């Protein structure tokens, strides 16, 4: 009896040892990889390697708008088949709110049976109250603006912008516009704040939509700011927004776009150690020489383009001819 018990115990031990030997633990599931950030060193190197300064001569004030030739404008006009127009501007915000710290000033100054008139003022032309076009005299790097012009000599509080002002675009911008509708790519109504849009997202959209932005085009990117606002209400946009990741900078240089339009100029909240929120905004404006349309509203354009399965169109942008101005309110128009 004792012998059988010892034998049984021995067999049990052998079985356990064998089971342990055969067990191979599976690797633990990993969460989504955190994309590396563009480092300050890379950012500084790109300022030299990707710069367009001097490309169109030492006296240039147009930057990549030089890529919009008469031939380019005629090709854009050929995209008009129906004569349907769509505004890309958000309505001017005349009341202060969480996302409008500096509203547009508006008031009636007369209203009689004979006539009526109002007054409108833009105390913060680059603020969150209106869709606007930035000139190169708006943001700078180390005391220099687009094409290397010294800021101290050419942009002053008393004299405004003697170079690179909004007046350089008095005759307007007409070119091919291309919409990159990232929420539609992802199958969502809008992206959540903090979402970073990478070059592969842009190229995935190109594959899905069958369209590609190129030299002299207007690159318009939608993340769904206004759709989110309509559903959830206003929120401080400087504290919560999606947008293009800084890794898009070399992609923009390669594509040679003439103009960029977006709903917000950056993404927040940002990962620890990231570059400042306006790093991409400032690089494109000052180093690449690409003018920017800030606070655009692409929701109506998204619907119009989807209804036609056409993501390219003629785009016109006409800033006010403000001498020595750093920017202007605009109402960009897409025409199908």
Model-predicted segments: where are they?
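Bacterial N-terminal signal peptides
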Residues: 10-21, 26
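Active-/binding-site microenvironments in catalytic and ligand-binding cores
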Residues: 27-336
